[in-house]
Amino acid sequence: MAFVARQTFEYQMPSTWYPGHMNKTLKRLKNLTSSNDIFVEVRDARIPLTSRNYVMEDFLNKKNRIIVYNKCDLADTFHTKAKVSKHRIQNLAQQFQNVECWFKETSTPEKSAFITPYVSKAPYFAKELLRLIRTLVDQASANGRVYVYFVGMPNTGKSSILNSLRNVALRKSKSAIVGNYPGVTKRISEIVRLFNDMDVYMLDTPGIMTPSITKPEDMLKLSLVGCVKEGIVHPVTVVDYLLFHLNRIDPSLYSKWSLPTNDVDEFLQNTAYKARKLTKGGFDENFVSNYVIQQYRIGRLGRFQLDTIDKNELLIRLHNEQNKKNAK
């Protein structure tokens, strides 16, 4: 009998992950920033709508903002598909908010081995972004200090982009701590000078989640790409959600480990055996689940978007977001 993938995914999720330091950071940003300041908002291209923080929208819409969709190479297998997705995101962004959108691929040595030829040179991206920031600074203020804040959800790559800009602009080693775990930055960081000839400074900020999630499935997406602290959603549930997507896209993406299956337990046991991830105690589902999740995050289980990118989906999200705001 031919394999038939699940068409729906049943789940019960935590409402959100919103530690106290996130709310403190948001309040501080609102109180400290001026009209001259620039905000670089970093989103994950695999979840371009889900990684949009509706709590910050009213605040950021009044600011000079650049949106960077990071990790584009992990969002699509084929470059032509990536271009289509970029155009869709760009068009949606231009329709609903007056911002500049940029797209960046991953650039770490570990990841680049598996995603060539889609990786763009980090220095090139940095130079172009620096040129845009200079333009915005000139437009914002003829004199006076300007701050460039890097904001977004946890683990979207804010610190890495900040360091890349600093390295290119000043030829200095990186300053912000970079980690693959959400919550590495817990407070607004030290002030870092951006240009030698301009009074412009950069600040890294902690990743900020939303106090509540507009769609329950979003917690699964955020957990899968690494925006949510490990353990908030059980790793087996995260893998089950990944398996759901893999089966709908192409079950052969995991053929090196298992035959097509909708059973996450069967999938994990087969993976543990084929990938040689059995521990001394035998089969450890959490250990194998975390291994599978990491393989997905570096592009070894296909590269695809988890969000549906269309106008209707964004309108639904905007409606749900407004309901959340009105309920306060």
From Swiss-Prot:
It is a peripheral membrane protein. Disulfide bonds: none annotated. One of its GO terms (biological process) is mitochondrial translation. GO terms for cellular component: mitochondrial inner membrane; mitochondrial matrix; mitochondrion. GTP binds at N70, K71, C72, D73, N155, T156, G157, K158, S159, S160, G207. One of its GO terms (molecular function) is GTPase activity. Residues 23-211 form the CP-type G domain. It is found in: Mitochondrion inner membrane. Its main location: mitochondrion. Keywords: GTP-binding, Membrane, Mitochondrion, Mitochondrion inner membrane, Nucleotide-binding, Transit peptide. Mitochondrial GTPase involved in assembly of the large ribosomal subunit. Plays a role in expression of the mitochondrial translational machinery. Belongs to the TRAFAC class YlqF/YawG GTPase family. MTG1 subfamily. This is Mitochondrial GTPase 1. It comes from Schizosaccharomyces pombe (strain 972 / ATCC 24843) (Fission yeast).
